[in-house]
């Protein structure tokens, strides 16, 4: 991985948006090709929907595994990608992507992390876990007191 100089974007071969099972498996596939990756996810830990919403749920559609728990799947993927040493950017949301004339991408996260990326893989699944707010005028005045949102 190329370390960025202060204020300069991180030069990355690939930025993967989403650290759920698909994003983790993408690290593995890229690693087999000798391509390093940066993973960006809004959650504070890898695993996406599997670990955030249903870690104990049995999964039946993984090739060569008749049944596998959601957390077990994530643990196996984490072990599988360990040799490829991805760079993690957890608790960050991609807020800006722009394709440049030279074919590379400028990517910026909610934490201000900036990338100069050769490619972007969108493995965001259902997207970031953010509540769908009530669309009524004035409802925001009651948020946190009488209107509460939670995703989990």
Regions from the language model: what does each represent?
Residues 1-17, 32-33, 88-152:
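FAD-binding core/adjacent interface of flavoenzyme oxidoreductases
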Residues 6-87:
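Beta1-alpha1 glycine-rich phosphate/pyrophosphate-binding loop at the start
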């Amino acid at each position: 991985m190329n370390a960025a100089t202060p204020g300069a974007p991180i030069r990355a071969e690939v930025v993967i948006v989403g650290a759920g099972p698909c994003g983790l498996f993408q690290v593995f596939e890229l690693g087999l090709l000798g391509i390093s990756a940066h993973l960006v996810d809004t959650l504070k830990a890898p695993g996406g929907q599997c670990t955030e919403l249903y870690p104990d749920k049995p999964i039946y559609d993984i090739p060569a595994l008749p049944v596998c728990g959601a957390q077990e799947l994530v643990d196996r993927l984490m072990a599988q990608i360990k040799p490829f040493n991805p760079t993690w950017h957890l608790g960050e949301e991609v807020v800006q992507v722009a394709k440049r004339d030279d074919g590379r991408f400028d990517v910026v996260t909610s934490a201000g992390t900036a990338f100069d990326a050769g490619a972007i893989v969108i493995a965001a699944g259902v997207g970031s876990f953010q509540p769908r707010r009530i669309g009524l005028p004035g409802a925001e005045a009651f948020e946190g007191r009488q209107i509460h949102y939670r995703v989990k």
